[in-house]
Amino acid sequence: MTISYTFTRELRLLTPAQFKSVFSKPIKASSAEITLLAIPNTEQHPRIGLTVAKRFVKKAHQRNRIKRIIRDNFRLHQHELPAIDIVVLVRNGVVEMENAELHKLVEKLWRKLNRRYNG
């Protein structure tokens, strides 16, 4: 059986209720620029929701770049993550980061979140 690296609708948090549930007693992994909040879900796979506030990232093309990089990184690492719902909160300082830097930071946060969930 081959591993699929697609990013389908079922891998996303879609409704406000799904987002809200993650904010109640989450497992956290954070850096100065990004915070990951997670709770266990009843699915067989992880799901992700992204929030990039205009307050921190003013221009739409910058917000889109950040979301695209995080989504792509999640798509590549989804099979290493447990069945959890994750909300990614982006804060100040991400705009100045290069794409490669952002990729490394997000990978580090996935590992940190995985350790906190499993241990």
UniProtKB/Swiss-Prot annotation:
It catalyses: Endonucleolytic cleavage of RNA, removing 5'-extranucleotides from tRNA precursor. Keywords: Endonuclease, Hydrolase, Nuclease, RNA-binding, tRNA processing. The keyword Hydrolase applies. One of its GO terms (cellular component) is ribonuclease P complex. The keyword RNA-binding applies. Its EC number is 3.1.26.5. It comes from the Bacteria. GO terms for biological process: tRNA 5'-leader removal. InterPro entries: Ribosomal_Su5_D2-typ_SF, Ribsml_uS5_D2-typ_fold_subgr, RNase_P, RNase_P_CS. RNaseP catalyzes the removal of the 5'-leader sequence from pre-tRNA to produce the mature 5'-terminus. It can also cleave other RNA substrates such as 4.5S RNA. The protein component plays an auxiliary but essential role in vivo by binding to the 5'-leader sequence and broadening the substrate specificity of the ribozyme. Belongs to the RnpA family. Consists of a catalytic RNA component (M1 or rnpB) and a protein subunit. HAMAP family: RNase_P (MF_00227). This is Ribonuclease P protein component. It comes from Shewanella woodyi (strain ATCC 51908 / MS32). The lineage of its organism: Bacteria, Pseudomonadati, Pseudomonadota, Gammaproteobacteria, Alteromonadales.
